[in-house]
Amino acid sequence: MPENSGSAGGITEYGALVAARKACRVCVERSPGTIRSCGEFEFDPDVVSHWELWLGHKRPKLLAVGQDFGNIGYFVRNRGRDEPNNKTNDHLRKLLVEAGFDVNYPPELDRNAPVFLTNSILCVKEGAMNAAVRAGWVSACADKHLRPLVSYLKPPVVVGMGNCGWQAVRRVLAVEDAPKRISHAAGSSWIAADQTLVFAVGHPGPLGVINRPWPQQIADWRRIGEAVSVLAPREREMDTRSGRE
């Protein structure tokens, strides 16, 4: 498990989130033959999000939500981890740098960058890597897994990347005045009822860069960086959570 996990109580809370993800079969039972639980596999890492094996800070300044971790073939081939030279990750790292984050090259674990990455669904698809993600899966995973993750991390900034990531973020943060379609929402931001800053951006994958061109994505992430740069420090909260004096 990545560091920055906090006190014993925090570790227990995080462990409960991991156990819930591994045990969940809601969408598998609703859509047999189209989606698989990663918890079926003995090599499934003890994480909430498989993306956090790159960026998984437990007191992040920013939580970013993408689409999925690929398909069952990708998951099994890489034993629950990302492969090097993943275009989505390479693009995302460049965008995070534009936002002012100094992050390791993926998939090397970065224990210091205050970023947590997750996806709109935590299971993996059967079929092709570009197979559709069903709206029902996103809604179910948002309610059962993303909502408690947000409650645990308490990120001051949350970013929905692409259509699925945006639908999940919009649902959990209840920014119902925001456009539902990512094509209308991308590039804009809102303040949730709990004062979380919510941003909608294009997905950093190859198709996402076609849908929202690279210069626009860079501009979007620079705006996110400006918002992050004026956040109040989280040191006091981090010290309290970790039990340090």
Predicted regions and their residues:
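Class I S-adenosyl-L-methionine
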Residues: 2-10, 243-245
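Intrinsic disorder/low-complexity segments enriched in polar/small residues
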Residues: 4, 30, 236-238
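A polyanion-binding, active-site-adjacent surface
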Residues: 6-178, 196-209, 214-215
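Short, amphipathic alpha-helical "lid/cap" segments that border enzyme active or binding sites
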Residues: 143, 215-229
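Alpha-helical scaffolding within the catalytic cores
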Residues: 181-190
